[in-house]
Every structure is written in C-alpha cells, then in structure tokens.
Amino acid sequence: MKEKLFVGVDCHKNTIACFVEGKFKEFSTTKKGFEQALKWAPKDCNWAIEGAYHFGLTFAAYLISKGCKVYEFNALSTSKARKIYSVSGEKSDYMDAKVISKVASDPEIRLQEVSLATIELKRKISKRELYVKQRTGVINNVKAGFVQEGINPLYKDFTTKRAIQWLLKQEDSEKRYAGKILETLNEIISQLEKEIEELTPEKAKRLTKIKGISTLRACTIYASTRGKKMSKAQFASYSGVAPVRNESGLKQGHRNNHRGDRRLNSVIYSVSICQSKYDPIGSNYYLKKLQEGKTKRHARKCLSRMLCNQIWKILFMD
C-alpha cells in the first residue's frame, strides 16, 4: 500500500512547527504565517495536526477553507512514537513534528479528519465555558462581599433576572457594577447557547433522550467524539471512565484514568450525579451498587460506565 504524504504539525500558542519529507520550518500563528506554511508545503499533501481542536484550531480551519485535508493527531501517540524515532527520547518541536509526519504517513494508521462544523461547534462551546467561568467568579465576589458585611442577601442564585435587578438597585456602587457585568454575561451566554443549539446535528439531539443530558451536554459529547470509531471499551477509556490497571508484585488493583478527554469526563460525571438523584433507573442502579458494598464514589463510577454504554450505542451503533 502506497504511503500518504503528511505534513506533521506541532502547534503552540505563538508558533506552528511543520515537518515533511526531511524539511522542517516554524511559522507564526498569524494569517501571514498560515499562508507561508501552505506555500512551503508540497502540493496535494495531507496535514496531521497535534491539537487540531485546541492550539491548532485556527490553523486547521484555515487549511480546510483552502481545500486541504486535515487530520487530528493524538498527543499521546506523539509521546509513544517519540521513543521509537529518538534513541535519547528527545523532546523538541522538530522531533514532535517529525514523529507526527512519519506516523501519519503509515498506511495502517487511521486518523480522524477534522471538519469545519465540529471546529465551529467546539469554538462556541469553549467560548460559553469561558463566560460561565467569568460569571461564576463575579458571583463568588458578590457573595463574599455580603458575607464580610454580615448581610443575608435576598437571593441565593445571582444568575436569575430578578437577582440581577435587585443588585442593580443596591446603594453600593460595586454591587451595581457587578449586576451590570452579570447582566451582560447572561446575554452573551444565552446567545451562545442559541447558536450552539442551531449547530446541533441530529445525532447529538438523540443523546437528549438520556435523562440528564441537555442539548448543550449532547453537543459537548458529540464534538468530543466526532469522526472517531471505537468500541465500548475504547470509548469508556477515551472518556476517562474506565479504570487503569495498577499492579506491582502481589499488589493488585486499579486507579482512576486521568488521561481521557477531561471535558467529556466532566459531562458524564455531571449526568451520573443527576441520574443517581432524579432518574428512577439510574437511582436504582446506584443504590444496587451501594448494597453490594461499593463506596459512593465506586457506585457512581459504575453508573458512569453504564452511561458510557448508552451514549456509545447512540453515537456509534445508530
């Protein structure tokens, strides 16, 4: 089987390191840098980008708009392959880009193609998360102010319109200013949620049939798994739910998997908490595991694994 020609790309905040056919060059993460990289690379080549949905997201979108085929390269694969291509285990931008190019060119390796729709969806989700964090920070400051003054506020949830209007009427200018910020952030978050819903594909909408999965959570799950092909066990491992063997000598056991997709893991964990409290099936399963002698933490892990199986059936079987 003929090898495909791949440009290996190691992306950073300010630079992109590219390697192909023994040539290596670094470019800036600007439009001019992207144009130079495309001109420098051989014609009709494919692009394998480490972090295509993170630091490499803008570059990936640019390449796709120019008609190039772009694939996502897993950072863990780079780490493993580095030991093969470098005797000393050298860690550099040159070595990483070279490894990505070499491994991606292997005909037996299958990579996930990056799509503009998924890039846009991930952009919106990331933006919303950023604004939600900012809103949480403002609310925490407001609550801390009330605690220091020994005042019991009229509202506990400062994300509601009534609570914000109440803040805007306060005599303290700092509280009024916080109310204005919260009002603006709420508008931005609501607008982003509408845009995310419009971008939601039909397959992601089917995930909302599972108790505890909202449209936003469904989009997050879909965006994290778009284009990937995996078994139930692989999906559980990818989401960080499946435990990792931790054995040494007579010691036998497992530990938590911290190498999975953390955003996906967070969503599944939140849904498992919701189901253990409000869903009859999830609650019964959770109680059953507790009766078997498992700890609350272990029982919730079991519930998360059951959720993984349900999500996998919708995403990869339907």
Question: What name fits each language-model region?
Answer:
Residues 21-46:
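Nucleic-acid-processing active sites and adjacent nucleic-acid-binding tracks
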Residues 2-21, 100:
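Gly/Thr-rich phosphate-binding beta-strand-loop-beta motif of the actin/hexokinase/Hsp70
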Residues 32, 209, 215, 220-296:
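Phosphate-backbone recognition surface of nucleic-acid-processing proteins
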Residues 71-111, 251-259:
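Short alpha-helix plus adjacent loop in nuclease-associated cores
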Residues 281-318:
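Acidic, carboxylate-rich catalytic segments that either coordinate divalent cations
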Residues 45-55:
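Short glycine-rich phosphate-binding loop at a beta-alpha junction
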Residues 101-123, 161-170:
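A short, charged helix-loop
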Residues 125-206:
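Glycine-rich, often acidic, oxyanion-interacting loops/wings at catalytic, nucleic-acid
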